[in-house]
Amino acid sequence: METSKNLSVLIAGPAGAGIFSSSVTLGKMFLRHGLNVFITNEYPSLIRGGHQWAQVRASLEETVFSHQKKVDIVLALDKPSIEKHTASLKTNGIIICDEEDASSLAKNNVQIRAFPLRKIVKEMNAPSVAINSIGLGIIVGILNGNIEIAEKLYDEQFRGKKETADLNKQLFKMGYEYGKELSNSFQGYKLPQQAIYSGTVSYTHLTLPTS
């Protein structure tokens, strides 16, 4: 059976952890692989605990204008995100998290893959938000994406800040190597290797009530 040429990734964590900016970066990476992209971002209410998530949906087959209830991959930047979004995964979906947050709540047909994300950030003397670059690298590695596309994007994103660009590229590459080791176990759609630059991108924002 031919694999459907679309995928959805959810990034979740505490407010202020760079969730939306990371979703935009991932969306641009997908876009430069030639996919059509739709990004949904939830603006959190601090009264509700400050949890935030963003979903990046991408398709090679058609322009997309909505998010999906079920996703292929969850990048969980804290333990509550694992607990909250496990149910959002498709069968055989993957949760990526820090090894300190690895949960025993995994359900059947859900893969939890834990990595020393915070430890790496600390050892690299990087800001805590840089954990996202490792996570994005793992995602793109799992999807067998083109690392040169990501590296060029970081150069553009941090133009004039070579040290910051190089740090994020290094962290991304470390994550990418982790992700490549998981690529064969992921049964969903894989990214085309070439840079095509032919997709479209759309955004929407969800603001949830405080009660």
Predicted regions and their residues:
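Anionic-ligand anchoring segments at beta-strand to alpha-helix junctions in alpha/beta enzyme folds, i.e.
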Residues: 7-70, 74
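Fold-independent oxyanion-binding glycine-rich loops
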Residues: 14, 41-43, 59-60, 71, ...
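Short glycine/serine/threonine-rich phosphate/pyrophosphate-binding segments
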Residues: 19-23, 83-84, 206
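Conserved small/polar residues in nucleotide/adenosyl-binding loops
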Residues: 204-210
